[in-house]
Amino acid sequence: MADKKIKVTLVKSVIGTKQDHRATVKGLGLRKLNSSSELIDTPAVRGMIQKVQYLVKVEG
């Protein structure tokens, strides 16, 4: 059975954000603006996305 995946895209710059928010974005596998990452939908990933929801766009 395939695990559900979600696509996360960085849509706002991390300049001027808190250090732990920058670390969370890096942990999601995002580097540059408009970079995307496909991640397995787990509670840990959902929590990371919720923490930086003002910086990212989520699909799927």
UniProtKB/Swiss-Prot annotation:
One of the Pfam families matching this protein, by short name: Ribosomal_L30
GO biological process, one term: translation
GO molecular function terms noted in the UniProt entry: structural constituent of ribosome
A GO term from the CC aspect: cytosolic large ribosomal subunit
Keywords: Ribonucleoprotein, Ribosomal protein
Family listed: Belongs to the universal ribosomal protein uL30 family.
Subunit (UniProt): Part of the 50S ribosomal subunit.
This protein's name: Large ribosomal subunit protein uL30
Species assigned in the record: Dechloromonas aromatica (strain RCB)
